[in-house]
Amino acid sequence: MKNPVETYMNLVPMVVEQTNRGERAYDIFSRLLKERIIFITGPVEDGMATLVCAQLLFLEAENPKKEINLYINSPGGVVTSGMAIYDTMQFIKPAVSTLCIGQAASMGSLLLTAGHKDMRFATPNARIMVHQPSGGFQGQASDIERHAMDIVKLKRRLNEVYVKHTGKSYEEIERTLDRDHFMTADEAKDFGLIDKVISSREPAESAVA
């Protein structure tokens, strides 16, 4: 059976540009990276997090004053992988704008709300879901107890991140995240996860002669 990731990568379009040295071909994501656009697509895991963090650091080195645009369409995934991306977003100098297209669930929603204030967006048909972390453990009773204590600490830390970026009280965040909580783009805006719902690009300002 073919690896679906390998099949997908073989379908990534190539873009050909004319340069003073002739033609140069880029895969579409590398070309968009030149425009300071990064995609978080699919499950959040270590491999993807490494690539996203590397791109963020590269763009910071290129220009520490120019904003970075993060497009998110993710069902969430591994908490530690998501927190690696989150910490890198907060660490670098450029402002990071986030835009949800499709869905931003679980860790995807945390990364969405972690964008720079007034630069967190979602398209009208996007879906956002927040919930508390989950985990499954087996082994000796003492080990299970330690894992349970750790996930409680993790839950508390994630709640604090949502409090920081939404402006909601800790109690309201804890209550909302107690179960899977789905939101439309407008509901996510009202909750403070994003700043604006956008359906089209704002027209460029006309040049003044």
Curated annotation (Swiss-Prot):
Q: PROSITE patterns from the xrefs? A: CLP_PROTEASE_HIS (PS00382), CLP_PROTEASE_SER (PS00381)
Identify the SUPFAM superfamilies for this entry: ClpP/crotonase
What InterPro entries does its record include?
ClpP, ClpP/crotonase-like_dom_sf, ClpP/TepA, ClpP_His_AS, ClpP_Ser_AS
Annotated Gene Ontology cellular components are: cytoplasm; endopeptidase Clp complex
- List GO molecular-function terms, semicolon-separated: ATP-dependent peptidase activity; ATPase binding; serine-type endopeptidase activity
Active site residues per record: 106, 131
User: Which top class of enzyme applies to this chain?
Assistant: hydrolase
Predominant subcellular localization, coarse grouping: cytoplasm
Give GO BP annotations, semicolon-separated.
protein quality control for misfolded or incompletely synthesized proteins
What's its EC?
3.4.21.92
Keywords assigned by UniProt, alphabetized: Cytoplasm, Hydrolase, Protease, Serine protease
Recorded catalytic activity of this chain's protein? Hydrolysis of proteins to small peptides in the presence of ATP and magnesium. alpha-casein is the usual test substrate. In the absence of ATP, only oligopeptides shorter than five residues are hydrolyzed (such as succinyl-Leu-Tyr-|-NHMec, and Leu-Tyr-Leu-|-Tyr-Trp, in which cleavage of the -Tyr-|-Leu- and -Tyr-|-Trp bonds also occurs)
What is the annotated localization of this protein?
Cytoplasm
Q: Which family does it belong to?
A: Belongs to the peptidase S14 family.
Please give the HAMAP family that the UniProt record associates with this protein. ClpP (MF_00444)
NCBIfam families associated with the record:
clpP, PRK00277.1, PRK12553.1
Q: What does this protein do?
A: Cleaves peptides in various proteins in a process that requires ATP hydrolysis. Has a chymotrypsin-like activity. Plays a major role in the degradation of misfolded proteins.
What is said about its interaction partners and assembly? Fourteen ClpP subunits assemble into 2 heptameric rings which stack back to back to give a disk-like structure with a central cavity, resembling the structure of eukaryotic proteasomes.
Q: What is this protein called?
A: ATP-dependent Clp protease proteolytic subunit 2
Gene that encodes the chain: clpP2
